[in-house]
Regions:
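Short hydrophobic alpha-helical segments enriched in small aliphatic residues
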Residues: 4-6
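Extended, charge-rich alpha-helical interface modules
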Residues: 15, 20-153
Length: 153
């Protein structure tokens, strides 16, 4: 299991070294995300497992889903939901024809299993989904989305 934890830590090391703190965790169904958002979340979601592995679950978790400060902390006690989401993202990427490194996925999966005692039964509320969709729309470049949608027809 140490091997899996080391791989999980190395997945985020590059971002930690650069001081990047943005971690995208979306609530909408992975099939509704653009390729860019889907791949970004696939890369960034494991950071929360890494954070909990290194620091434990923080005491000051926001009560409600939030964007910006507190976004990562909100998910630290929802590892079961995150793991399920990660599996869904992985499957959606495969369905779209992406070549995904299955070893990296397995490493995250194995590390997540160690921490799955945090069972939250989290289900996003309609308001949380709306907030997430509004953020996605704000960040999307409409022309790029149109091009991606037309290429999938």
């Amino acid at each position: 299991m140490e091997y899996a934890n080391e791989n999980l830590l190395s997945l985020t090391r590059e971002f930690e070294l650069r001081g990047c703190k943005m971690t995208r965790i979306n609530l909408v169904c992975p099939s509704e995300l653009t390729d860019k958002h889907l791949m970004a979340e696939y890369r960034e979601l494991p950071r929360i497992f890494t954070y909990v592995n290194k620091h434990g679950v923080p005491n000051d978790i926001p009560e409600r889903y939030t964007l910006g400060k507190g976004h990562v902390k909100f998910f630290c006690d929802k590892l079961d939901w995150l793991y399920s989401r990660y599996r869904s993202i992985f499957c959606e990427l495969i369905n779209r024809g992406f070549a995904i490194d299955k070893r990296a996925y397995s490493s995250v999966r194995d590390s997540a299993w160690v921490m799955l005692g945090y069972e939250s039964r989290y289900r996003p509320t309609p308001e949380e989904l709306y907030l997430n969709m509004a953020r996605l729309c704000k960040r999307c470049k409409v022309d790029n989305v149109k091009k991606e949608l037309s290429s999938n027809d």
